[in-house]
Amino acid sequence: MRHIIRETVVGLAVALPVLASAGVAFAAAGDGDAERAARWQELQKQVFGDRKVEPGKLVSIDMPVRAEDAALVPVTLTVADKDQVKGLYLIIDDNPAPLAAHVDFGPAGDPAQLKMRVRVNTYSNVHAVAETKDGRLVASEIFVKASGGCSAPMGMTDADAMKGMGDMRMKFSDLTADKAMPATLMIRHPNFSGMQMNQVSREYTPARYLDRISVSQGARNVFTLEGDISISSNPVIGFEMRPEGSAPITVAATDSQGGTFDHTFPVPAVSN
């Protein structure tokens, strides 16, 4: 994953110089269309290099236009022609780390729909970019009004936020023959952004977030997600998969401080 702002973001005192040195223009809620368009052009270069990103309707974004909780904003990406798509990018243009997630789908994955919760730090365009199997990049856009999502405290001590870190649960819908199976993965992890102030010590909590999540059934990969601080605490990821046989589903995750977490889940029985 191309981190635009890497895990050196450990607090506002560090984050602001890092952003400035990276040449990232600071966003403002009152920015006009021209400023936002220029920022998107710069982000395309940072994330995709010289590759062309074309607008289109291959992937759609469903998010609340005005977020009730900027630290827990639900987002659903829906792919119009899933057989074309091998990966998805979610970019929150005006976040300190704009590239929220890059998801690559494996042979057991189904790109039809992907759900997660994200932090939105200020009024921002949000882009979803679908990468096709023939190498095209197709982007869609939505504007979201939110404020302070990356710096919002979790409402508990850091120690409490880290209790049970790495615990996982998986919920499955009914498995029907010849159809993709919806599933929801829940991982307990604070995903500290580095911009949250400890309400007791009044110091910034160092960044610690899940940077890679891989889901597989046996030797067949479902998806691999590379993430950053824009994914909300205690990530919840909704996805679809096409299981084969009875091999268990394995989840392996790592975080930016070297933590490793894994869990195995049995495959549900096929419904009649």
Predicted feature locations:
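Bacterial N-terminal signal peptides that target proteins for export
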Residues: 1-12
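A general "mature secreted/periplasmic domain" signal
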Residues: 28-156, 170-180, 184-271
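Sec/Tat signal peptide C-region and signal peptidase I cleavage site
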Residues: 18-27
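Long, charged amphipathic helices and adjacent flexible linkers at domain junctions
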Residues: 155, 160-167
